[in-house]
From Swiss-Prot:
One of its GO terms (molecular function) is translation elongation factor activity. This is Elongation factor Ts. Associates with the EF-Tu.GDP complex and induces the exchange of GDP to GTP. It remains bound to the aminoacyl-tRNA.EF-Tu.GTP complex up to the GTP hydrolysis stage on the ribosome. Pfam families: EF_TS. Belongs to the EF-Ts family. GO terms for cellular component: cytoplasm. Keywords: Cytoplasm, Elongation factor, Protein biosynthesis. InterPro entries: EF-Ts_dimer_sf, Transl_elong_EFTs/EF1B, Transl_elong_EFTs/EF1B_dimer, Transl_elong_Ts_CS, UBA-like_sf. SUPFAM superfamilies: Elongation factor Ts (EF-Ts), dimerisation domain, UBA-like.
Length: 303
């Protein structure tokens, strides 16, 4: 009988997953040393040992169905920009993106348990890739898009450094819609809006900005009776910066995104609205590990 204590010990020694450790111990009739060898032979121990490294590089990949009715965006991380360009790594990211679009998974854990290559799960394929390439990798996040009237569009910038996906609703069917959607995606990539419209700005963020602007105005020595007007003016400016519909279009600074949609709606004969968007920037929010230079030199010198 394989005990929980034995599984725990094997996990601590190899860093491999719980189920992999249990299988290895079962295969070797509980022999700890042989189980370690089994995991090493399968590449699972080596892969798991790399899991302590920070994976802050990688790629953002998108998938849009041929009819443009559904799509997905995923971020998959690795340790170096060199591996981020590896064909197998990029191919894996593309297949995962397509899987997300065609599945009902809601969490990364559920995605990792989905079948990707025949009987192999995403996690198993990823583990094999880690062992083969020799770097830690992780599926970090994803979003799925689906629309009935309208379309889904995507845009990738900088070879996967930034990825955007947007969902536009429109009753009319026109090539113009795809063009508008591409422009909207490029806008999101370039201007990084936080909200769709002023109505979507959460009250907490708004109040925080108001406090900052009020303090700035008072510190500038402005009279109390005009401070409120100044604050409202600066809030309006803030919304133009962070709300997609209020932003100046990157292709024409005299026109806002809402104005662009208004013009194109007239052109296609039906209202065009943005119902959802997301922007992923590779590695954002991941704290990279900083190596101590002296330690690095010592390591290279074999000290």
């Amino acid at each position: 009988m394989i005990t929980a204590k034995a599984v725990k010990e094997l996990r601590e020694r190899t860093g491999a997953g719980m189920m992999d450790c249990k299988k290895a111990l079962t295969e070797t009739n509980g022999d700890m040393e042989k189980a370690v060898e089994v995991l090493r032979e399968k590449g699972l121990a080596a892969a798991a040992k790399k899991a302590g490294r920070v994976a802050a590089e990688g790629i953002v990949k998108t998938y849009v169905s041929e009819d443009m009715k559904k799509g997905s965006i995923v971020e998959i991380n690795c340790e170096t920009d060199f591996v981020a360009l590896n064909e197998e790594f990029v191919g894996f990211a593309g297949r995962v993106a397509e899987l997300v679009a065609n599945s009902n998974v809601n969490t990364v854990e559920e995605l990792l348990a989905e079948k990707l290559d025949g009987d192999k799960t995403v996690q198993e394929v990823l583990t094999e890739l880690i062992a083969k390439i020799g770097e830690n990798m992780s599926v970090r996040r994803f979003e799925r898009f689906s629309v009935e009237s309208g379309l889904v569009q995507s845009y990738i910038h900088g070879g996967g450094r930034i990825g955007v996906m947007a969902e536009l609703a429109c009753e009319a069917s026109s090539p113009v819609l795809a063009e508008v959607a591409k422009d909207v995606c490029m806008q999101i990539a370039a201007a990084n809006p936080l909200f769709l419209s002023e109505a979507d700005v959460d009250q907490e963020s708004l109040e925080k900005e108001k406090e900052i602007y009020r303090a700035q105005a008072l510190n500038e020595g402005k009279p109390e009776h005009i401070v409120d007007k100044m604050v409202m003016g600066r809030i309006k400016k803030y919304c133009k910066e962070v709300c997609l519909l209020d932003q100046a279009w990157v292709k024409d600074g005299d026109k806002s995104i809402s104005k662009l949609l208004e013009e194109k709606s007239k052109e296609v004969g039906s209202p065009i609205t943005i119902t959802k968007f997301v922007r992923f920037e590779r590695g954002e929010g991941i704290e990279k590990k900083e190596e101590n230079f002296a330690e690095e030199v010592a390591k290279m010198g074999g000290k």
